[in-house]
Structures are given as C-alpha cells and as structure tokens.
Regions:
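RNase H-like, Mg2+-dependent phosphodiesterase core
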Residues: 12-215
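N-terminal amphipathic/basic-hydrophobic helices that include classical n-h-c signal peptides
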Residues: 1-16
Length: 215
C-alpha cells in the first residue's frame, strides 16, 4: 500500500498509524536523540508533549523520512505541540562523560526545558537514567510506535542537521552538510588528510577505516 499526503512524498508499506499515548489521563513526553554514532558535532535530544488527540499520516521514525519531509514535519510538530524542547551536549562533553551518558544528559536538558512538566516519559531505546522523580518507560524502536517519540526524533534530527550545516561553513573539507558528522568513507578520508577539528570527538575511533561505529 502507498499512502499519499498533500505536500509530502509517498511512503510505501505504511501499514499502521502510530499510537497517540501510552496512558490517556496523564501528561506524557516523548524523548529521542540524534547524532549518537557521529564522529563530529554534538548529540542532540528532544522532548515533546503532544495533544492526546494528535494524529498524523506521515510522522514516523525520522530515519524513515526524507530531509524534505522532516523539514515540513518540524514546523508542524512545533505548531501542534503543547510543549517541546531540544537539548545539546557538545563533543567536548561527550569525550568527558561517554556517549551514552551524554545522550541521556541531552534528554534531561530537553525535559527540563519543557514549559509543561510531564508526569511520564516515553524514551526511545533501552537505556535511561531517571529524571528527578518522573516515571519513565524505555521502548526499543519507540520512534516507530508512538507519535510523541517520533516527533522528538524529527526535532532532534532536524535541529542537529541544521547545526552541522552551520559549522560545515567553517570546515567545508569534511562535507558535514552531507554526512552530518557520521563516519562515512569521505569523512574519514578528510580526517586522515586534514586532521581533526575542534568539533571532532576525540574519544571516538576517528582514524579507523571502518565505515560505521556500533554501540
């Protein structure tokens, strides 16, 4: 089945719509991060509280969407959300605390910035450190199950991509406008040729010839 929506590209095999909430009568925030496996730049997380009746035909895991779709969805999420926030943890802090702790720290920053305090957190993945006394549930591939997590996925990805495009202007040799700091062959080749920048994560295997990092 192919689903079409005005101003969007078609998505094939979209079988079921995501869930609007886990618990109906409490305020839930969905949380996700972007940039965990990159060699350069920050890890960025978002927290989003959506109305309980929020529905969307296209919103899903940001990795399944095109850049054009994410850009349109970013504006729709921001205008529809009850509250939203993004949190950044830069590469120096990542090197100090490790990428897992930095990813969760970015989520905490985003949650803390919400104008409305959540009563429950839906966390993408399987690892999280509790935020204050707020209860939470970790959900593997949650960005493909709940709208709030998918919305957080889109915001984290789009805000991080915009940041990487901005710093690309300082160091165009690394093609961050295209690879966004991920360990592509061209990115690693540029590191070997030009060395590292102030935005690179020194605790990562920057000069390894492998094309990706597994966590």
């Amino acid at each position: 089945m192919i689903v079409y929506c005005l101003d969007y590209e078609p998505i094939a095999e979209l079988k079921i719509m995501l869930k609007s909430y886990l618990y109906k009568n409490i305020t839930e925030a969905g949380c996700d991060e972007a940039g965990r496996g990159c060699l350069a730049g920050p890890v960025v997380a978002a927290a989003v509280i959506l109305p309980k009746n929020f529905k969307h035909d296209i919103l899903n895991d940001s990795k399944k969407l095109s850049a054009k779709q994410r850009a349109v969805l970013k504006d729709e999420i921001i205008s529809s959300a009850i509250s939203w926030k993004v949190g950044f943890v830069n590469n120096d802090e990542i090197d100090k605390m490790n990428i897992l702790r930095a990813s969760i720290r970015a989520m905490h920053i985003a949650i803390e910035g919400l104008e409305k305090e959540p009563q429950f957190l839906l966390i993408d993945g399987n690892r999280f450190y509790p935020y204050k006394n707020v209860k939470h549930k970790t959900i593997i591939k949650g960005d493909g199950l709940f709208f709030s997590i998918a919305a957080a996925s889109v915001l984290a990805k789009t805000f991080r991509d915009e940041y990487m495009i901005k710093i690309h202007r300082e160091f165009p040799e690394y093609n961050w406008d295209k690879n966004k700091g991920y360990p592509t062959f061209a990115h690693r080749a540029a590191i070997i040729k030009y060395g590292i920048t102030p935005y690179h994560r020194k605790s990562f295997s920057l000069f390894n010839t492998q094309l990706k990092i597994d966590f």
